[in-house]
C-alpha cells in the first residue's frame, strides 16, 4: 500500500465518473474473483487499465501482472490515499528473508505503478510518492487448530453456534472469492474457535482463530478480529476473577 501527493482531484474524479469500474472488472490476474452475482454491477474503486496499457506499450515489463487494485480517497490537497495496488505472491509471513524480499519488491513495484499512473491516468501527471505503508501487508500466516475450526459452509450459510460470542456480516474477501455485506446476512462466531486443542488457559484471537481458508477470508478482517478480541478479553477477565479455565467458561456469560 502507498499514498500519493500531487494528484489533480478534479481530473482524477472526472476519469472515474467517465469510466467507472465495477466489481465484475476484478477479473484478471491476482484480482480474479468469484462473486455471488449481486456485487457485479456495484461501483468499485478499481484501477487496472493504466497498468495494462503501460505493459502493452513497453513502459512496464510484460511479465508484471501483479499491479492493479483499489484506491481509497482523493483529497482537495491532491493526496490520493490507500493505493492498494501491489499484490505479491509466495511471501511467507513467518520468514524474515521473505518479508525483506517482499518489502523490497513491493516498493520497487510501487514506483513502477506510479510511473504508469503519471503516464496514463488523468490527474496523475504530477503525482509523486507521499509515503509507503509501514510494512508489507500479510493476510495469512499460522492458524490455530481449535476446538472448533470454522468452515466455508459456516461463513457462506449464516452459521449458528450455541457458544456464539458475537456476529459478523457476510463479508468474504480472499482466496478468489468476494462477497460483500449488502443483504443483512451474518454468521455467528463460536467461542471454541479461539480455544486451542490440548492447551488449557489460553485464548487465541485475531486472524489466527481456527478455520479453513474461506472461513479465514471472512474472519481475518479487522472488524471481525475486533469482535473476537472483545470476546477473548471478556473471557480472560472472567477466567481471572473466577479462577476458571478458559475452556470451562460459559459462552453465554461471555456473550
Enumerate the language-model features and the residues they cover:
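Mobile, glycine/GP-rich and aromatic-enriched active-site lid/loop segments adjacent to catalytic centers
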Residues: 1-205, 209-215
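Internal hydrophobic alpha-helix adjacent to the cofactor/substrate pocket in enzyme cavities
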Residues: 226-243
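Non-catalytic terminal regions with compositionally biased, polar/charged low complexity
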Residues: 239-255
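Amphipathic, heptad-repeat alpha-helical segments used for oligomerization and assembly
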Residues: 209-224, 228
Amino acid at each position: 500500500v502507498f499514498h500519493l501527493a500531487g494528484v489533480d482531484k478534479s481530473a482524477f474524479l472526472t476519469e472515474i465518473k467517465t469510466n467507472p469500474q465495477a466489481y465484475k472488472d476484478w477479473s484478471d490476474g491476482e484480482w480474479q474473483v468469484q462473486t455471488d452475482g449481486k456485487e457485479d454491477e456495484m461501483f468499485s474503486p478499481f484501477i487496472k487499465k493504466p497498468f495494462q496499457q503501460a505493459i502493452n506499450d513497453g513502459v512496464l515489463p510484460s511479465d508484471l501482472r501483479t499491479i492493479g487494485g483499489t484506491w481509497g480517497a482523493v483529497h482537495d490537497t491532491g493526496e490520493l490515499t490507500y493505493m492498494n495496488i501491489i499484490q505479491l505472491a509466495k511471501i511467507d509471513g513467518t520468514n524474515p528473508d521473505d518479508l525483506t524480499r517482499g518489502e523490497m519488491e513491493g516498493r520497487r513495484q510501487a514506483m513502477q505503478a506510479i510511473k504508469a499512473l503519471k503516464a496514463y491516468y488523468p490527474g496523475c501527471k504530477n503525482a509523486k510518492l507521499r509515503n509507503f505503508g509501514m510494512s508489507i501487508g500479510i493476510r495469512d500466516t499460522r492458524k490455530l487448530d481449535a476446538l472448533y475450526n470454522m468452515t466455508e459452509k459456516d461463513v457462506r450459510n449464516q452459521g449458528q453456534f450455541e457458544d456464539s460470542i458475537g456476529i459478523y456480516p457476510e463479508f468474504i474477501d480472499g482466496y478468489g472469492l468476494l462477497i460483500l455485506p449488502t443483504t443483512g446476512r451474518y454468521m455467528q462466531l463460536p467461542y471454541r474457535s479461539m480455544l486451542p486443542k490440548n492447551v488449557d488457559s489460553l485464548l487465541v484471537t485475531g486472524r489466527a482463530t481456527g478455520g479453513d481458508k474461506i472461513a479465514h477470508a471472512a474472519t481475518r478482517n479487522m472488524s471481525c478480529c475486533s469482535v473476537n478480541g472483545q470476546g477473548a478479553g471478556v473471557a480472560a477477565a472472567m477466567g481471572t476473577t473466577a479462577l476458571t479455565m478458559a475452556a470451562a467458561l460459559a459462552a453465554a456469560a461471555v456473550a
